[in-house]
Amino acid sequence: MEWDSAGRGFNGTKLRWSQLEQILSGSAPSADDAASVHSPAREAPEMDKDPQPRPHLSLVRDTDMPAAPPETTTIPFAELHAYSNYHFLNGASEAEDMVRQAQRLGLSGLALVERDGFYGAMRFAEAAAEEKISTIFGAELSTDNGVLTVLCRGPEGYRRLSRVITAAHMQQGNHNRQPRYPDFTELARAADNHWYVLLNAALANNAEDIVTAFGANNVIAECHVGFIPEDADNVRIVTDMAATWGLITIVSCTPNAATRADAHLAAAKHALSDRRDLNNAEADCPPLGGTWLRNGAQIRAALPPLPHSDDMIANTVHIASECAFTLNLIAPELPTTDVPAGHNEMSWLEHTVWERAEARYATRTPELWEQVRAQITYELDVIKQLNFPGYFLIVCGIVDFCKGNNILCQGRGSAANSAVCFALGITNVEPISAGLLFERFLSPERDGPPDIDIDIESGRREEAIQYVYNRYGRDYAAQVANVNTYRRRGAIRDAARALGYPQGSIDAWARRAADPPEQVIRLAEQFRGHPRHLSIHSGGMVICDRPIADVVPVQWSAMENRSVVQWDKDDCASAGLVKFDLLGLGMLEALHHMVDLVQEHHGKTINLWELDLTDSNIYAMLSRADAVGVFQVESRAQLATLPRLKPRTFFDLVVEVALIRPGPIQGGSVHPYIKRRNGVDPVTFDHPCLKPALEKTLGIPLFQEQLMQIAKDAAGFSAAEADNLRRAMGSKRSPARMAALKKRFYDGLFQTNGIEGQVADVLWNKMTAFAAYGFPESHSQSFAALVFFSAWFKFYYPAEFCVGLL
C-alpha cells in the first residue's frame, strides 16, 4: 500500500495499522478509533505468480474464516440498499442469512433490493418476521438512463412498484425478456409520491431530470461507502448533488453478502454476470470480492471527514422507519364467481352439489345414498364455516370446461376424500364406499384453503391453462414460478467458468469424465443451492381478486402465451395466493382412448366413477403381477412386490403406490410393511401416541400426512405448526428454521407426552428422514384410482387397453 510522508493512507486521512485491520476485517473500531478514522483503506491485491487460472479469494470457505465475536453498536443504523442471492448473479448470501446478520449487528431495518423484481421478497419478509427486524422493500429498475433504485413508502408504494415492474416485463411480449420502463416523468406519475428514489454518483448526469420528475421530497441522495479509495470522490459527488437540489442524504455500503466469508462468492458471480473470468473482472470488484453488512460504528468510521456524517446516518435510520412495513398488509383473496340471480356463492354451490349428486349416485345402492346425503350435508357445513365456496366453484368451472370440451380430467390429492368433490365431478373415486376420511381434505382446524390438483390428459392441458387466462383475465391469473438453483453440474460449470478454465475441461468435469481441481470443487460448493434463474412450475396457477401485480410482479415465461409470477409455490402460499395445479398426465389420455374405443366397438358408455372398486377380479389379476401397461405398477420393483403384498382392497393399491418409491426402498420400509401386512412380524409403535397416525400403515410411516399427524399427536403441534414443519422439512431446508422447529418438537414431546432422551431422538430422526421421501396420501389415492381404472380395462377389454396405450 502507498503511504505519503505524513503517514497518510488513501483519501489523505491519517490511518493506523490497527485501524486499517479493523476496517478490512469488519470488526468494530474502538471508541478512539471511531472518532479519528473517517475513511477506509484498500488492501493491496495479492500477487500470485502461478500460471492461469489461479486461485482467487472467492475460494475461501466459511470454515476458513475466524469466527467474529458478537458485535454491538452504539450508533443506530439501517441498511437501505442490500442484495441477497435473489439478485441473480450478484448477491452471495441467502435472505435469511442477511436478516440474521443484520439483527446480530443491531441494525434497525434492512432493505433487500433486486433487479427488476421482488423475487426474494417473501423469503425476506418471513425471515425478518422471525428475527423481528423491520423490512423495507424496493427494487432496482433497469431504465434507459441507468439503474434506478426505488424504495417503497409503505404498502401502496409496493403495489405501485410491482405494477410498474410488471408492465415493463409484459409489454415486451413473449420473446424479448428485457424489461422496458417509461421515462422518469411517467415513472413519477406511477409512483404518485409513494416511492423514494435513491440518487447515487452513477446517476449524476441524470440528477436534474430525476429531481424534476419525482420532486425533491421524493429523492434521496445516497452516499455509497464501498471501502475503496474512490469513496471520497463518490461521496463528494453525492453531497454536492444533495446541496444543489436540497435533498436528504443517507449512507449505504450496498452489501451483497452477509459476512466477509460470504463476500468472496460475490466476485465469482460478478464475473459470470459480465461474461468474464475472475482474473479479468477482479479490477472492478471491491476488496475481497464484495461488500458485506456493517454496523453503524463501522459505517461512521469509513465515511470521509464531513460536517454532516452523523446526520447522514441518522437520516438513514429515519427513512428506514418511515418505509418499513410487512407484506401481510397486501394479502389477496380469490375472485368472486358470478352466480345466478337470487344466489350467493354458498347457495349456488349447495344447489349445484345436490343437483349433480343425484346423477353421480344414480347407479349406487339406496343404503349408500342415505350415507351420502348425511356426508354431503356435513361437508357443505364445513365449507360454509370456512368460507370456501368460491374455491370449489372455481375448480368446478375448470373441470366443467374440460368435460364440455371432451377433455378427460380428474382431481388429484386429498380432494378424493370429499363427497362434495365427487358429486361435482371433480374426482372419480367415491369416497364413502372407499372408506376415505373427509377430515384429511378439509377440517375446521385447517389453516388456509384446500388443495385440489387437477390431472388433465397431457395432449390437451394447454387448452385448460388458456381457459383460466381467458376466464379470469391475464391480469388476474398467472402461473407459478419454479426457482432453478445450482446443482452439482451447473455449479461445476459456473465455478470453472469463473476461474477461467477452458470449455473442454469444463464439459469433462460436468459429465464426470474427469475430476475437477480442488479450487473448482470448493467454489462450486459455494454456488450449490443458490438461485440461478426462474423457470415455470409444471402446472401451478394462481388466481386473484385483484391484479396479481398488486401482490407480486408478473413476467412472460419462455413458453408461448404463459405469464408467470416471480415467486415459487411456497412463497405464493405464504403470501396468501391460492394455487391451482393443472397437471398433464399421459395415462388419462390413454384412458380417454380406451373409453372411446369401447364405445365405438361395443356400444357401451364407460363412466370411470361408476366402476366397482371392490371388484375381486381386478385385485386377483394384480396379485398375479399381471400388470404390464397398468399405471404406476408395471416397474420391475412393483411387479415383484404385487404377489407379496397381494392387494385385496383399494387402500392396498394406495399403499402400493406410496411404498414402491426410491425413498421407502432406500429407507428400508418395504420389507417391514409387507411382513407386518402378511402377519409375519407384529405391529409395533415406538410410542403409544404414534398409534393414531401410523395404525393404518401398520406402524410404518408412508405418507406425508402422517408426519403432520405425528407432530400434532406426539408434540402437541397445531395444524398450522404441523404444516409449517412439513414445509420446513422439504427439499429446501433452512438450518436455522429446522433448529427452531426441532426445539419446539422436543419441548412439545416432553410437555404433551413426557417423551425425552433416546425416544425423542428416535422420533425426530425418523421424522426428518421420512420427510425427505414421504409421498402424499392424497396423491396416492388419486394414482391408485388410475391403477384400478387401467387394470379394469386390461382385464375386461384387453384389446382396447393395448390400443389405448399405443
Feature names for model-found ranges:
Residues M1-S84, M98-G109, I136, E140-V225, ...:
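Conserved active-site carboxylates
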Residues T13, I75, S108-L112, A128-K132, ...:
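Noncatalytic, beta-rich nucleic-acid-contacting surfaces in large DNA/RNA-processing enzymes
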Residues F77-Y86, C253-N256, S538, P776-S780:
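Histidine-centered catalytic micro-motifs
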Residues G91-A95, G117-A127, E230-I237:
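Active-site-adjacent beta->alpha loops and helix N-cap segments on the catalytic face
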Residues Q103, A129, A191, G215, ...:
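Anion (oxyanion) recognition and catalysis
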Residues R115-G120, F227-D231, N256-T259, V483-R487, ...:
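Acidic, metal-coordinating catalytic cores used for nucleic-acid/nucleotide bond scission
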Residues A125-A128, I237-V238, H264-K269, G425-T427, ...:
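Short secondary-structure boundary/capping segments
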Residues I248-A261, G411-S414, H537:
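Short acidic/histidine-rich active-site segments
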